Amino acid sequence: LKESKEPVIVISHQPIAGIYTIDNAVEIQNLLSVHASKIILAINGHAHVDQLIQVAGVTYLHLTSASYYWVGEKHAHLSMDADTHANYPSLTSTCPYAAVLFGILTLDRKQGKLTLTGRKSSWIGPSPLELGYSILSKEEQGLYLQPQISDRAIA
């Protein structure tokens, strides 16, 4: 980043800011914030949430999973037919989406705009909130834990 003359998009699997951050998130945020003017976006996916936040001048985007949210064995349930669950036993620990999710990022460097065109789906079976999944608060689940990738305009 120090030597880059071009704008940069930082891509990581696990979150650097927001929900479910890596252990040394603050250290990485501090390193990135020094170069905030060069960073268009920092993007990650691991948390399976739909969240956009700013920390110290850097915009961080969480992209949700393409197909499900993991709730674990404690919240195991049947969301599909018995044959599907027999073939894919791990499905009982997920809240799957009815349609695959994806987003399209478009960068317009002349106008200095980045847009994300997302996609919405629905839960197959109960949502994590309906199952009593408790790592996130009810408010956070309502805001960030949805079967969707939101449309966004990032300047």
Specify the residue positions occupied by each region the protein language model found.
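Binuclear metal-dependent phosphoesterase catalytic core
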Residues: 51-155
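His/acidic metal-ligating clusters that form di-metal
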Residues: 1-59
